[in-house]
């Protein structure tokens, strides 16, 4: 079980990512556009650096919705492999069952 503070930190990061997504995308478009002048590009770089560090999508970590476990996360279900197996064995995941061949 992950600490409550880690879960809260990840929730805050997710909020920041959605809040600054449009602004970050616009600045990156200015930076990567070949027609942009050097001065405008430099201003965009400085503005991008001034944004909160946690607003970057690469800082967000996928976590299990039940336990907060960061490893063994399956996106399709939003659970870690351990909790997914437990739910499958209880028959709570439709269309999913233990493999047998």
From Swiss-Prot:
InterPro entries: Ribosomal_uS14, Ribosomal_uS14_bac/plastid, Ribosomal_uS14_CS. Gene3D superfamilies: 1.10.287.1480. It comes from the Bacteria. One of its GO terms (molecular function) is rRNA binding. Disulfide bonds: none annotated. The keyword rRNA-binding applies. GO terms for cellular component: cytoplasm; small ribosomal subunit. One of its GO terms (biological process) is translation. The keyword Electron transport does not apply. Keywords: Ribonucleoprotein, Ribosomal protein, RNA-binding, rRNA-binding. Binds 16S rRNA, required for the assembly of 30S particles and may also be responsible for determining the conformation of the 16S rRNA at the A site. Belongs to the universal ribosomal protein uS14 family. Part of the 30S ribosomal subunit. Contacts proteins S3 and S10. This is Small ribosomal subunit protein uS14. The gene is rpsN.
């Amino acid at each position: 079980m992950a600490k409550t503070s880690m879960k809260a930190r990840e929730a805050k990061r997710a909020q920041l990512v959605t809040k600054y997504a449009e602004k970050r995308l616009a600045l990156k478009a200015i930076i990567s556009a070949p027609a942009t002048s050097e001065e405008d590009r430099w201003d965009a770089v400085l503005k991008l650096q001034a944004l909160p560090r946690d607003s970057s999508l690469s800082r967000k970590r996928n976590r299990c919705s039940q336990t907060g476990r960061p490893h063994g996360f399956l996106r399709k279900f939003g659970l870690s492999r351990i909790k997914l197996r437990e739910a499958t064995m209880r028959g709570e995941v439709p269309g999913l069952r233990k493999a047998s061949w």
